[in-house]
Design a protein with these regions (language model features):
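Short glycine-enriched loop/turn motifs at secondary-structure junctions
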Residues: 2-4, 55-59, 99-100
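Short, flexible helix/strand-to-coil boundary loops that buttress conserved ligand/catalytic motifs
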Residues: 22, 75, 120
Length: 134
């Protein structure tokens, strides 16, 4: 059996502004249009499909596995845009990154309060005795 993640919806007050904001920070191409969606496509074929929501938006968490060079580029854009970032999801370590499982990671607040994260190694992927998330 083969099961792959394909897409998820991201609720936004302004569909295109939110999709462009995320694309800009991540260094992705301009979103494409598919019906009511502004779509960001990733290298593995999965998509984030941004859709307008006029009601109260419940913030969600979206994490992206990135290479070391991409991490550096994204982190630079976050700093250039004067965005706050944290090493942890509880906002205890502002302006720092984590080194979970021997990689690097950080969190920032994206459009409509969604919590975005980049990591260079999946959590839980370190060898026994490896570094833990800080």
């Amino acid at each position: 059996m083969s099961i792959e993640f394909n897409h998820t919806l991201v609720h936004a007050k302004d569909t295109w502004a939110a999709a462009r904001e995320v694309a800009g920070v991540l260094g992705l191409p301009e979103p494409t249009s598919y019906g009511p969606f502004a779509v960001l496509q990733f290298d593995n074929g999965a998509t984030l499909d941004f859709i307008e929501d006029t009601g109260e938006i419940k913030a969600q968490h979206y994490a992206f596995l990135v290479g070391e060079d991409d991490f550096d580029a994204i982190w630079s854009r976050i700093k250039e845009q004067d965005r706050q970032f944290w090493a942890d999801p509880h906002k205890h370590t502002a302006g720092e990154i984590n080194h979970g499982d021997g990689g690097r990671g950080l969190y920032w607040e994206g459009p409509d309060g969604h919590w975005l994260e980049i990591i260079t190694r999946p959590y839980g992927s370190a060898d026994p005795g490896g570094s833990e998330e800080s």
